[in-house]
Amino acid sequence: MKTNQHRSHSGGFDRRRFLGACGAGALALGGSSFLGVSEAFGQTASGGRFFLREDRFGRMFPGLPAFFSRTGRRLTEALVDIGKPGGILDAKDNLAAGPVALVADPALSLNNPNNATHTAGTTFMGQFLDHDVTFDLGSRLNVPVDPEDSLNTRTPAFDLDSVYGGGPRRSPELYGYQGSRIKLKLENGGLFEDLPRRSNRSAILADPRNDENIMIAGLQTAFYSFHNKAVDYVARRHSRWDSDDIFKEARRLTTWHYHWMIIHEFLPLFIGQNLVDDILHRGRRFYRPRVGFIPVEFQGAAYR
């Protein structure tokens, strides 16, 4: 880990200052996978009240009236029209060419071109971030559920609970000890490191979705490796610290670097550097809930 200052292309922030400023948001990273669950009341447009909780999904603007008061024929027809072949959501690709050719040959996707500023890895980093803040285990297809009643088994913060689980005590299957050093388990012996696996080759993970494909599994493995290197780094600098303190500091460093990647690499690709700089300098002005939670509008629509 380099200690020299690194200036970002935003021109106003250096790496050291950013990592130091993140400390207040990462004080509780060494223990439980859930933050202390906070609650607040919300109110709908019709005057109904409900709980907002960190471990539940919610609505971004609960006071707004419904777009459509009830599901009827007109609404159904409108939705079918939007999604029909040739409709406004149809990219009009030549589906007969097959999925591989449509991905590999840009000439076949003139109506749906690749993003010139995104690498292929951007997609999978986005998937990794999503798995760190949302995991709905209870909802079922075609079974309407109020978002306030839907359990989110991930914390509504970028704290890498999808990597660390509940920590060494609550998720011991993820960890191994090297003397006083608590490290995440990795399998070695092949061409590259791999996630730890059971005899049936299923991965031992805090979030099973992070073995859905080789790219997301590679990202998970990279964070395991980074944490383990951070453990060695902290142990060398603080030889008198016990295993818990070394682990907590290594997790803090890993999480701070993760935050740096989100702010300075990922977000500018999607919302532009100017908006990132505006938020960093002027703060949030519109969405400032008293209790942190993931809005269902973000989880199910905007982030997609």
Please name every model-derived segment:
Residues R251-R304:
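Extended amphipathic alpha-helical segments with heptad-repeat/coiled-coil character used for oligomerization
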Residues R17-A40:
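N-terminal export signals
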Residues M1-D14, E39-F41:
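N-terminal secretory signal peptides
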Residues N188-I214:
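Acidic/His metal-coordination segments adjacent to aromatic residues that form catalytic metal sites
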Residues Q43-D194:
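Carbohydrate-associated surface elements
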Residues N111-N112, R209-A217, H238-W241:
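Second-shell loop/turn segments in exported
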Residues A230-F247:
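Inter-helical turn/loop segments and adjacent helix faces that build the functional surface
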